[in-house]
Amino acid sequence: MSTIEERVKKIVAEQLGVKEEEVKNESSFVDDLGADSLDTVELVMALEEEFETEIPDEEAEKITTVQAAIDYVNAHQG
């Protein structure tokens, strides 16, 4: 079983069409990985599906980096 961090990075790479090794914890979806607003919405939806959770819009707006996504999932698992 892969870790939450590995799973988040894999989803980010798939959704944004970048190589997994380019996805760093500190990477900003928009500034570093080239995401636009639609990409970020689709990314949040993919995270919700993968981790079987619902991310409210006000929380989703705060998830702007890979680490923020990892932290959110870690805090809301279980």
From Swiss-Prot:
Residues annotated as domain Carrier: 2-77
Listed GO CC annotations: cytosol; membrane
GO-annotated molecular function: acyl binding; acyl carrier activity
Gene Ontology biological process: lipid A biosynthetic process
Keywords: Cytoplasm, Fatty acid biosynthesis, Fatty acid metabolism, Lipid biosynthesis, Lipid metabolism, Phosphopantetheine, Phosphoprotein
Cell location: Cytoplasm
UniProt PTM: 4'-phosphopantetheine is transferred from CoA to a specific serine of apo-ACP by AcpS. This modification is essential for activity because fatty acids are bound in thioester linkage to the sulfhydryl of the prosthetic group.
Pathway(s) of this molecule: Lipid metabolism; fatty acid biosynthesis
PANTHER family: ACYL CARRIER PROTEIN, CARRIER DOMAIN-CONTAINING PROTEIN
Similarity comment text for this entry: Belongs to the acyl carrier protein (ACP) family.
Function: Carrier of the growing fatty acid chain in fatty acid biosynthesis.
Protein name: Acyl carrier protein
Species assigned in the record: Pseudomonas entomophila (strain L48)
Gene: acpP
